Amino acid sequence: MTNRTAYFYDPDVGNFHYGAGHPMKPHRLSLTHSLVLHYGLYKKMMVFKPYKASQHDMCRFHSEDYIDFLQKVSPNNMQGFTKSLNTFNVGGDCPVFPGLFEFCSRYTGASLQGATQLNHKICDIAINWAGGLHHAKKFEASGFCYVNDIVISILELLKYHPRVLYIDIDIHHGDGVQEAFYLTDRVMTVSFHKYGNYFFPGTGDMYEVGAESGRYYCLNVPLRDGIDDQSYRQLFQPVIKQVVDFYQPTCIVLQCGADSLGCDRLGCFNLSIRGHGECVEFVKGFKIPLLVLGGGGYTVRNVARCWTFETSLLVEESISDELPYSEYFEYFAPDFTLHPDVSTRIENQNSRQYLEQIRQTVFENLKMLNHAPSVQIRDVPSDLLSYERPDEADPEERGSEENFSRPEAANEFYDGDHDHDKESDVEI
């Protein structure tokens, strides 16, 4: 197959609900996927229904007690887990909701399968917009995140890759990933985020640089309110180029939190969808194996626009600014475009002097790095997941005709003659 981009999507992942009034909306994943379909971008990718991560997979990073708790707790029995809820920081921002463990299993499994396919050179780019939940810690939930799919995926990548670079463009600091790899030079973490004024999670000062073997392999770029495309570009591109030149990663993981866009419900930056996408395109340009993940993003319609646009950049396909008609078309009113104006009146508090100070400090830290730390040759551990699924029929075994026929629902998406959603069927 000539196409080297793998796209992972579970049709049920958008049906989970954190609860009334909660800003995290998994439904944004359904909107994103719908646009990917209706723009025809799926034709440019290998599309996979992903593996579901097991408890064992999650315990590669998280504690067994914590994962066991996530599997057992539910809205119906949570009164019996009062002590555990406090211990594991579940409740409030990280609520117990129906299907919590199942949700974690689905988004984590997709990221893990993406890492495995990169390891086996099945693809050059793997995309999982459901992943990127970067705040989860070893022993607890944090910031709407329960299982840290990023850390688990990087651990899988490290079986084959001596050096993995992690880049985070979410408005919130990637604290869970930084903490996991703070003491090692095998993973370099680079986070661009809002810092100061008690903004969550309160970490990510530029003087947090790593420790022990990981000293100077942790890079933080703390930003102030209102940063725009031009200011962000002037920092992002030279910093990432320098990091790649110094560190020489053999694989990159890119967390594309869309809460750094202007007009985000929880954000205070002023990036446009094109400006956010420029970062993705710049990282892709290094032609290094790349795992692309979602993350934050709380104005649902703009998250879907952003990740759809970035999918188009990753597969190098130009798409129209006019959105295609889909079942979620009304979400994108009143303009129905891919690139609406998302700028706000928030003043850009990142002065030229401030940006220059950050750049100089970051480059000073980079000079302290050992170029491309090496790893001793060793046996490669077995893959964390197997591609043989016991619940799926053997494709080599011919079954009866009835196994291959099914009713075709009128509201389902089909490519070709089976598509019921003809232009004549809809009134706009």
Curated annotation (Swiss-Prot):
Regulation affecting activity: Inositol tetraphosphate (1D-myo-inositol 1,4,5,6-tetrakisphosphate) promotes the histone deacetylase activity by acting as an intermolecular glue between hdac3 and N-Cor repressor complex components.
Region of interest called Histone deacetylase, as start-end residue ranges on this chain: 3-316
GO biological process: angiogenesis; circadian regulation of gene expression; dorsal/ventral pattern formation; epigenetic regulation of gene expression; liver development; negative regulation of transcription by RNA polymerase II; posterior lateral line development; regulation of circadian rhythm
Broad class of the protein's primary localization: nucleus
EC number(s) reported in the record: 3.5.1.98, 3.5.1.-
Basic and acidic residues biased stretches: 386-405, 415-428
Name this polypeptide is given: Histone deacetylase 3
Catalytic activity: N(6)-acetyl-L-lysyl-[histone] + H2O = L-lysyl-[histone] + acetate; N(6)-acetyl-L-lysyl-[protein] + H2O = L-lysyl-[protein] + acetate; N(6)-(2E)-butenoyl-L-lysyl-[protein] + H2O = (2E)-2-butenoate + L-lysyl-[protein]; N(6)-(2-hydroxyisobutanoyl)-L-lysyl-[protein] + H2O = 2-hydroxy-2-methylpropanoate + L-lysyl-[protein]
GO cellular component: chromosome; cytoplasm; cytosol; nucleus; transcription repressor complex
Source organism superkingdom: Eukaryota
PANTHER family the UniProt entry points to: HISTONE DEACETYLASE 3, HISTONE DEACETYLASE HDAC1-RELATED
Binding site for Zn(2+): D170, H172, D259
Binding residue positions for 1D-myo-inositol 1,4,5,6-tetrakisphosphate: H17, G21, K25, R265
One Pfam short name: Hist_deacetyl
Family per similarity comment: Belongs to the histone deacetylase family. HD type 1 subfamily.
Active site: H135
Chain intervals for the UniProt region annotation (Disordered): 381-428
Gene Ontology molecular-function annotations: chromatin binding; histone deacetylase activity; histone deacetylase activity, hydrolytic mechanism; histone decrotonylase activity; metal ion binding; protein de-2-hydroxyisobutyrylase activity; protein decrotonylase activity; protein lysine deacetylase activity
UniProt KW keywords: Biological rhythms, Chromatin regulator, Chromosome, Cytoplasm, Hydrolase, Metal-binding, Nucleus, Repressor, Transcription, Transcription regulation, Zinc
Top EC class of this enzyme: hydrolase
Compartments, record wording: Nucleus; Chromosome; Cytoplasm, Cytosol
Signal peptide start and end residues: none
Entry function: Histone deacetylase that catalyzes the deacetylation of lysine residues on the N-terminal part of the core histones (H2A, H2B, H3 and H4), and some other non-histone substrates. Histone deacetylation gives a tag for epigenetic repression and plays an important role in transcriptional regulation, cell cycle progression and developmental events. Histone deacetylases act via the formation of large multiprotein complexes, such as N-Cor repressor complex, which activate the histone deacetylase activity.
